[in-house]
Amino acid sequence: ATVKVDNSNFQSDVLQSSEPVVVDFWAEWCGPCKMIAPALDEIATEMAGQVKIAKVNIDENPELAAQFGVRSIPTLLMFKDGELAANMVGAAPKSRLADWIKASA
């Protein structure tokens, strides 16, 4: 399953995570975000222990979106050891999402 992250737990759940974390920046009104949500849930389950998938609602956390320069959604950011390691903008099929996550993690 994916983890909901906001300003209060971004530091602990993402930046201080021992495993790589993919952060999905999304919003309720974003069709493509809703399209990839089930795929991200499946990938989170399939890759449990290897990678964590977190979700940030940009309407509730505009400062996090601004901090990482997120201008369009969905945007996926991969963090490793507290550093931004890779990013992917836009929706994609599950296979492509999984390949990107595996390659980046």
Curated annotation (Swiss-Prot):
It comes from the Bacteria. Pfam families: Thioredoxin. Coiled coil: none annotated. Residues 1-105 form the Thioredoxin domain. Keywords: Disulfide bond, Electron transport, Redox-active center, Transport. Disulfide bonds join C30-C33. GO terms for molecular function: protein-disulfide reductase activity. The keyword Secreted does not apply. The keyword Transport applies. GO terms for cellular component: cytoplasm. CDD domains: TRX_family. Participates in various redox reactions through the reversible oxidation of its active center dithiol to a disulfide and catalyzes dithiol-disulfide exchange reactions. Belongs to the thioredoxin family. PANTHER family: GEO12009P1 (PTHR45663:SF11). This is Thioredoxin C-1.
